[in-house]
UniProtKB/Swiss-Prot annotation:
Keywords: Ribonucleoprotein, Ribosomal protein, RNA-binding, rRNA-binding. SUPFAM superfamilies: Prokaryotic type KH domain (KH-domain type II), Ribosomal protein S3 C-terminal domain. One of its GO terms (molecular function) is rRNA binding. Residues 217-277 are annotated as: Disordered. It comes from Mycobacteroides abscessus (strain ATCC 19977 / DSM 44196 / CCUG 20993 / CIP 104536 / JCM 13569 / NCTC 13031 / TMC 1543 / L948). This is Small ribosomal subunit protein uS3. Belongs to the universal ribosomal protein uS3 family. Pfam families: KH_2, Ribosomal_S3_C. Part of the 30S ribosomal subunit. Forms a tight complex with proteins S10 and S14.
Amino acid sequence: MGQKINPHGFRLGITTDWKSRWYADKQYADYVKEDVAIRRLLATGLERAGIAKVEIERTRDRVRVDIHTARPGIVIGRRGTEADRIRADLEKLTGKQVQLNILEVKNPEAEAQLVAQGVAEQLSNRVAFRRAMRKAIQSAMRQPNVKGIRVQCSGRLGGAEMSRSEFYREGRVPLHTLRADIDYGLYEAKTTFGRIGVKVWIYKGDIVGGKRELAAAGVEAGRGAPDRPRRERPAGTRPRRSGSSGTTATSTEAGRAAAETPASDGASAPSAETTES
């Protein structure tokens, strides 16, 4: 199952978060359609900007759009003209006030979406697919936070009559481990032989203490009773022993005194009442 499913959807709520964050009842379908239109608008108008992901948050009268890009200068434009144009297009599309945030991706070689887009651009420029895949893998494995990568190309590779899929992998990519931080990207290259799909999986280590694990740990801690402090036993005393009628006399002061007094052969040891008197 982990080999086929989208890694982001497979780990939602465990190690990954939703890219659209809002609540709706009757307008749910309209909001989903609107989110798809927003992402499509940004993808078609900013192909060369290197957009890694788009996050959308909604309030009652405002929409916040966060664009994570490797080239923020292209998105902002000269004196912010491009950003103003994008904001105007989004406000026209949504009919609400739009807050546009442009965030720079610090390490584009470790972002799966940007790696897939880079391989697809090379395929469109008639670069050999094996060379493009190996070059992307070498660049990604140089990053300190990348533990493994897998790149797959599907389509009429090299102009072959029959389409096929080929992939290269380096390092470790545990797709079925839920705590694994797997970044996934998909992009399509438009070539003269048709479209070639490029998929990239990047493994960045394990996330210990995900959302569900932390929540479960909090619930278990709330259920358990608080530990009571243990009292120190005075030196030279014996632990109490339970008898048929409660505590024996050896656990009391009188019992200890009677135990320490040596008894004669013909006389029995004095009882607790005799010692007290």
